[in-house]
Amino acid sequence: NSDIVKKWRFVATLDLKTSRQCQALDKTTWPLGQGPLPPLHYRCRSTSVAKLDDAFDMLEEGAERMARDPETGKSGLVDNKLSYYDWLKRQDLPYVQSVLGKDRAALLLKGGLSAERFAALQLDRQFQPMSLAKIAKMDEKYIHSAFRKAGLNRYLDKPGLVTGANKPIELS
């Protein structure tokens, strides 16, 4: 059905055990035959789904997806429009910190970044997780501002910022 399916969407599991790669790639869309197709790693639970032509977007209105409730451990439904990081922002601070670590959680929750922009900073161009130190060295003012808002100045005080060399990956 190449007339209505031209892209595919990465769909990650919404729970505590999802890998950093899958967290960051959740809800990204790619042209058919391109992008990091799941499974990405051993025991990967992510999947891919067809992304219909924009003319069919009305079919996704009101759609839901499964997520594991952090308190009960039971599966439930959440809005299909939520990405992994949108969903994670709705969880309690201790849960977010257990998933991301204290500093990365602060960047997500206090840095003023959208979930989409936060996701784009998590992986390098080979789709490998990036350290906070490496992210902080990127030559982007909004990144430095986010680190300051999150109280993570110690990452910015380290030498090694290379102007223009480090750019966040563009996820579509």
Regions from the language model: what does each represent?
Residues 1-172:
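Activation/maturation switch segments at domain boundaries
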